[in-house]
């Protein structure tokens, strides 16, 4: 990760806590890397690819560089990024990918997870990383190991397939969180929040458990999810002909949370408010009330 990256101090602090090496520039990053994983807010996906091609263009090298775009963008968006990389005429192999599931973490000894395997990474929970495109990692001496450790799965030779899978997957998970946020905020205003939770807990206990986990976890990420919902809307419109209104509405929910004077200031690892479903509903309701109140 380049130290001069326009990342927030919080991002740099998390990188250091995770013992990720910080480099001085994109050129240093490209010079020292065989594979670059791009994981940035969706709005920055194209610009990040351009930064890498610009950095590589400044080096006198014929060594191949793998660029793995793992960002939450529409198939058409990642295809445009891939086309831009190809036009650079640089020795870059472009891989389309996505991240499905939660961040990796150590699991208790002998605990089984959906990502456990027989290799030495089996004591970690790992998200699934579907990849697509014609470029695999066969030319790398550590290619097979990389695929295994990162839990990658080749799903298609077509650029756009892995990103499309992310869009369909996230529509169900983050789309649900947007709906739940609206539902519980409205119930708070009506004075029926506890009653709603009781009824959902009786008839759909798994749904309540999902909401109680996903909604409080959302505020620090809401600013990223605005564009992700827009990319889902674009995907469903371009690939299936659906109207964009549903997920543009979800984007609006996350925009309201990101701009909320309380919830919008929440940071991962430094949570103060919105750590429960009830408090998200309360803070969101207060923010929307202020927004609607005439000045």
Language-model segment annotations:
Residues 73-174:
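Rossmann-fold dinucleotide-binding core
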Residues 257-295:
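NAD(P)-dependent dehydrogenase/reductase Rossmann-like domain
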Residues 18, 79, 83, 243-246, ...:
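Metal- and O2-centered redox machinery and metal/ROS homeostasis
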Residues 8-11, 45, 49, 78, ...:
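A general structural signal for well-ordered alpha-helical segments in protein cores
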Residues 26-97:
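Rossmann-fold NAD(P) dinucleotide-binding segment
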Residues 1-20, 24-28, 190:
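NAD(P)-binding Rossmann-fold cofactor-contacting core
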Residues 162-273:
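Helical "substrate-binding/catalytic lid" subdomain
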Residues 19, 32-33, 149-150:
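Short, well-ordered alpha-helix to beta-strand connector turns
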